[in-house]
Amino acid sequence: MGKEQKEKKDGNLSIKEEVEKELNKKSTAELFRKIKNEKISFFLPFKCLPAQHRKLLFISFVCAVLSGGTLPFFISVFGVILKNMNLGDDINPIILSLVSIGLVQFILSMISSYCMDVITSKILKTLKLEYLRSVFYQDGQFHDNNPGSKLRSDLDFYLEQVSSGIGTKFITIFTYASSFLGLYIWSLIKNARLTLCITCVFPLIYVCGVICNKKVKLNKKTSLLYNNNTMSIIEEALMGIRTVASYCGEKTILNKFNLSETFYSKYILKANFVEALHIGLINGLILVSYAFGFWYGTRIIINSATNQYPNNDFNGASVISILLGVLISMFMLTIILPNITEYMKALEATNSLYEIINRKPLVENNDDGETLPNIKKIEFKNVRFHYDTRKDVEIYKDLSFTLKEGKTYAFVGESGCGKSTILKLIERLYDPTEGDIIVNDSHNLKDINLKWWRSKIGVVSQDPLLFSNSIKNNIKYSLYSLKDLEAMENYYEENTNDTYENKNFSLISNSMTSNELLEMKKEYQTIKDSDVVDVSKKVLIHDFVSSLPDKYDTLVGSNASKLSGGQKQRISIARAIMRNPKILILDEATSSLDNKSEYLVQKTINNLKGNENRITIIIAHRLSTIRYANTIFVLSNRERSDNNNNNNNDDNNNNNNNNNNKINNEGSYIIEQGTHDSLMKNKNGIYHLMINNQKISSNKSSNNGNDNGSDNKSSAYKDSDTGNDADNMNSLSIHENENISNNRNCKNTAENEKEEKVPFFKRMFRRKKKAPNNLRIIYKEIFSYKKDVTIIFFSILVAGGLYPVFALLYARYVSTLFDFANLEYNSNKYSIYILLIAIAMFISETLKNYYNNKIGEKVEKTMKRRLFENILYQEMSFFDQDKNTPGVLSAHINRDVHLLKTGLVNNIVIFSHFIMLFLVSMVMSFYFCPIVAAVLTFIYFINMRVFAVRARLTKSKEIEKKENMSSGVFAFSSDDEMFKDPSFLIQEAFYNMHTVINYGLEDYFCNLIEKAIDYKNKGQKRRIIVNAALWGFSQSAQLFINSFAYWFGSFLIKRGTILVDDFMKSLFTFIFTGSYAGKLMSLKGDSENAKLSFEKYYPLMIRKSNIDVRDDGGIRINKNLIKGKVDIKDVNFRYISRPNVPIYKNLSFTCDSKKTTAIVGETGSGKSTFMNLLLRFYDLKNDHIILKNDMTNFQDYQNNNNNSLVLKNVNEFSNQSGSAEDYTVFNNNGEILLDDINICDYNLRDLRNLFSIVSQEPMLFNMSIYENIKFGREDATLEDVKRVSKFAAIDEFIESLPNKYDTNVGPYGKSLSGGQKQRIAIARALLREPKILLLDEATSSLDSNSEKLIEKTIVDIKDKADKTIITIAHRIASIKRSDKIVVFNNPDRNGTFVQSHGTHDELLSAQDGIYKKYVKLAK
């Protein structure tokens, strides 16, 4: 066991180790030094403001300072008011002056708030756009080290910190600082000795703050890394949900999630404990200062009375004024410090953003770079290169070759030998480590303007990425960069004061003449839909697109999930060709196409290659696609062998090539080059061997026939190639709308209902609906932590009662100041009491804050885990919905749950504290002076209501945004609100980063996101004004209330109704309560946001999956007894999310046990859907799809009783369902049997454990190679992993890496080539030892040698391990040895059925069979 555990440890880099590795880039001491020595400008967040907004900042600052300066005046007359009330003198003139000051404070605070809200909106927008521009223009090494999920997570986190730290919190700092300084200076002038005595604890508070701040920063930095890791786990799991479900990997993902969250909680709780300790110390030390003040103030009065201080008229009224002044200034400090902490977080976040914004990319943009009249030649000279993430692995060894205009070049070689990296170097995603890339003999690629260079390149990658947009816009994206030039010019003209933006405009404008710029703008204006249609016809997708209900406006879905792989690839080809590039790069451009589509697209590519002004570069494993290239370069990363084997046997050559020649760690080089014919002459050459491995064996009897027959066949093929057979090819019409939904512009029912017309202010002040009872699940979770809740309860009891008791002691102390006989005794007594209160306050506040945060973290972790777990186990139709994209769901899991914690969980404690404080204060106040207490209670309730209305603005803003989502702002073809959401657009851009860079869409997306931000902020001016008015009232309300209280108290005292002493006791208790009420109401906005988040969280949390692997029901399976026979009987199927598209029509066939069954058909004919049904991603049970016959718009309605989907006309959506003639009912029915038992009757987990699937686009996770291979089988040892790696022909490559099986594959496996990813996926599938192996284009990304090895391995596995194999492939060579080949066909678009089935030879013998035509096209 010890050895196995060691092996597992060696091969498994834990989450903690990964994060510690990240932290160790800087030692702990270095981190402390950095925190200490970072010289960050205090006004850094405002650095990006243009001149006009800086004027607003100055106005806001001045008004905030003047507003705070009004408070010292109130304190200065406080003693006079007390004196006049005791003497019965008139105080009305003083009250009127206080009211006047209150009005001034109201106006000043309102102006300050309005200006700051405008500034905050501008800052957040500018920082976001500058961050995005910088990220978009970074180099490939940067993006290797900073995956999109991390960049997006960091951006959200940092902007949230900036948003929290500026705005009203920033002006609060200056307002209250002004009050603090004014009061403190006044107190010093009044009596410096007493003031200094009271404030002697300030240095200690400062030292504690510095020490605590260092500890908090370090722990929060660590916790942020773990939080980023958690987000990466969530996003990858949702992106690869089909892989997770098919391998029953939910528990594996959840375990990694729990581990990451555990470490996050550990470090965040350390930070929270230090913060709680700091808060407790501040509260306790402030009360200690008052104990000193009470004692020393008495000493001064006594000494003054005995003439120890000559000429000192210091008396009790002076002590009261100073104590109150310092008391309020101290309270100002307690408000300032948390806001300063928030602002310091904003400073640090801004600094982190500017580290990215100011980062100079390794591949510079070359503002003044050269532009060339043409591109005639590209030459690699002794190029060496390694990736920054794997510096020990050299990719190339003195690579040299030349590419010339008008020629076509192909690069071939084993997977991982660096073919795709050549393309990345040409695109200048990276620069060579050594050597040069020379253009036109004399221009180094580094000296050429980067944006201009990339504008001349069209790319079709191996794994095409499309945006969640329409087909039309996806094709147009290649020319949208031209639109950016015009949009950016207008933008910069309007923002001429912004240096950063001007610099970027200079980048473009300096690289071309005004005439060129004008021509490009003119060229963009001519991009018409007809151009899109023309290019679609060239790549043969026009018929397919035209058959869709929305045609070119059809949305492709998140990650193009509504398209098959072949459809995505052809749209990607159309996008590249639309650009008419000077350099056309085709990286496995036809790897996902069926033979017929490949032939047609390849013919188009061949036509394009004839362009005399274009360099065409092709990478392909299908060597038939490159035979007409002018030059073929064969790359190898193996050691040269002088002993060539003369044996012509393919297998022997293959074995020699792979086993005798070891991988060369010094990098790849060109081992052969030439035309197809010249390379084929070398019988022992690698290229010749690769060709032989891909040859398709025709029927032996046909091959042995007469030469004339062969010649005729050859002639027929040539005729078809030249066009004589084109009609026949086109007659095989392409019906590929399996995965396309009817994406008509779907409007929500609520958007069509007439909204209640309520005036704005009435809407603000009307009563809210009660919170949903469902919130009890959160409260229940909170109170499940009984020990923590008990500690919080007692700490609230203590802390809630201490302030009113302190207020009572304060009032009694004031009374003793006029009782000179007992003055010394009473002051000593009250000083001791306050010291005891200070100790109790320190303990209670520390415990309350720490356990409040502790429960919050526990609840957040639990809620996040439950939501993530419930989402993971949903059926696939849930993820097919546009509202459930990975980006949206991950936001729900992270942001919404966090808002629930801060807005509900944490605020419960604060609210409970306030209730306790309020109840004690009211009891005391009513006891001493019921009349004053009643009036003040009424006034405070009105004041609190105003606070609540201000807080509701946040919620109303969100509601208004939702109400306005139906208006069209962008050039999208859908009304879906995602396209108007900046977060969604950023998610799109970051996930498709390579495409954004390739097609120069950096500025396009920045402009699009800017419009989305402007739309989001649209119409907020009135709301800002109302918020400013309410803020002004909140700042001046205390002055108005006190003025009224003094007037009312004076009135009652004059009438003899109450005593001055009782009035003071009642008043002081309410002063403390009112100050805490303001703190409570300032958090009200968080509560409203939390309730909004709960409305999103709760439906996802309680949603029951219709196909749940957690269900233990069903027939349990003994794996050893399963034979593996699969029967498909009369299956009719439509996707619930795409009800108008029939997928299958009475589909029936059998996959025999222990045999290999291959499925072939055109792209989009439903081949992959069969595997989805087999894995029970979708069910055929009780699914009814009801369509309205005259449907124009769709609205989904899920009927939970019979699991049916009802789609109705939105405009007629009502309680009446209409007559039966208005609807057409389709049933998903039929059976899929495994060993003669319906698969729905089996236990779902047991069923999926019988299968292993290797998909066309394999999904790997951001883990080590070892962890990825053992995914789905956690009990596997390192030896098991190594064994299957040899089967998958990937072991030699892994062993050549510095970290071997511990090598991390990067986010989504991006650190590996396509072929390497696919071989690891094959190893992962084999490790599960499945009874049924599903191969969906499993070898599409492999080189010929690896493909042959894998095919041989698969045959051996089938023979030795009793496995049923079901394979989908477009390469006929990979399926010709199958026991049965099933041909899918969908000629009338009414659903796919089985056209024919049989062996390869049987199907070839059929006259005019579709399969025979496929074989012909594959030659």
Swiss-Prot record:
One Gene Ontology cellular component: vacuolar membrane
Pfam assignment, any one: ABC_tran
Vacuolar side: 82-90, 190-191, 297-316, 810-829, 1054-1057
Lipid bilayer topology: Multi-pass membrane protein
Residue ranges annotated for the ABC transmembrane type-1 domain, each copy included: 58-345, 791-1083
EC number annotated for this UniProt entry: 7.6.2.2
Outcome, altering residue 1034 to C: Decreases ATPase activity
Stretches of the chain found on the membrane's Cytoplasmic side: 1-60, 112-168, 213-275, 338-788, 851-907, 950-1032, 1079-1419
Residues annotated as binding Mg(2+) 2: 1168, 1256
One BP annotation, GO: transmembrane transport
Record keywords, A-Z: ATP-binding, Hydrolase, Magnesium, Membrane, Metal-binding, Nucleotide-binding, Translocase, Transmembrane, Transmembrane helix, Transport, Vacuole
Extra facts: Can transport human ABCB1 substrates rhodamine B and vinblastine. Does not transport amantadine.
Region spans: R domain: 1-37
Catalytically driven reaction(s): ATP + H2O + xenobioticSide 1 = ADP + phosphate + xenobioticSide 2
Cellular compartment(s): Vacuole membrane
Enzyme class: translocase
Residue intervals passing through the bilayer: 61-81, 91-111, 169-189, 192-212, 276-296, 317-337, 789-809, 830-850, 908-928, 929-949, 1033-1053, 1058-1078
SUPFAM superfamilies the UniProt entry points to: ABC transporter transmembrane region, P-loop containing nucleoside triphosphate hydrolases
This protein's name: Multidrug resistance protein 1
Chain segments carrying region Disordered: 639-665, 697-752
Domain ABC transporter span(s) in chain numbering: 378-662, 1126-1416
Record-stated family: Belongs to the ABC transporter superfamily. ABCB family. Multidrug resistance exporter (TC 3.A.1.201) subfamily.
